Amino acid sequence: MNVMVKKEWIEKGYVDEPVDEALDLKAEIRKLCKEKDAIILAHYYTVGEIQDIADFVGDSLALARKAAETDAQLMVMCGVHFMAETCKLLSPDKIVICPDLNAGCSLADSCKAEDLKKYKEEHPGYKVVSYVNTTAAVKALTDCVVTSGNAKKVIDSFPQDEKIIFGPDYNLGNYINSITGRNMLLWNGGCHVHEKFSVEAIVKLKQKHPEAVVMAHLECKAPVLAVADVKGSTATMLHYAQEHPEIKEYIIATEAGILHELERNCPNVIFYPVPPEVSEGGVGCSCNECEYMKMNTLKKIYNALKFGWPTVEVAPEIAKKAVKPIEKML
């Protein structure tokens, strides 16, 4: 795809071109997808209007599987940058677009490739298991990749006495250690959204809604997971709610974007999002949202499809190594 990329786009990280306010963006996006043989992949944490126009909505594991099997020539990954990298690794011959290159991830940022390389050298004989929320460069240093949906299954596949470095999500690794009896070395990284959930906030909601079932993502801290009735990935939460129609109330400790899919699939159920902890004297948004996921907008998706940019590439020498642990996971 030959694209004339403007300097100002590169500086901003996305295509910033005016769009007629009278334009039906949802309809135009679907039209462009048809013209360009494109599909839109969206994570559960994106805003509802993006999930509504997506060809496929899922968690990291489901999105990776979809990227590996699609016949479409172009993928628009509405999530964060590492997800777009994963799409490119699994479908190197396809065009992968990330609507805003600024859509990073605090968890991925907590583990730099050069730091992991040094840590590996300090711990010879250890296998490296990396959470999918990592850059391609980190995956290239990894023996196997996991998601919150399959972490236990993957770790169980290793001999019990295998020496393992697990990262970058400390909370997920700590939980897996606790239920498997292992003693993996844990990288001290975390998701800035899930780190802010507290037991106190859950208890307050539980007092107001005593019949509500508490569901928490595995990226939450150990005390939060300890009071949760259901622990798992976003897909785990969604499936649980669908499979238990007798339950009419849930308390949800994860990014608020999942509420759209939960409410769409379970219209007769009430979901209460857990508010995050705000430090004393803190200012700003007291919301359980990932600002990176919310960088994806209809306007950016429309412009990205129209102009064919920003595309995501992975250096061949990194891609060759990084794709192996992902394929092993799948």
PLM features: what roles do these ranges have?
Residues M1-I252, I258-L259, R264-L330:
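Active-site loop-to-helix "anion-binding N-cap" substructures in soluble metabolic enzymes
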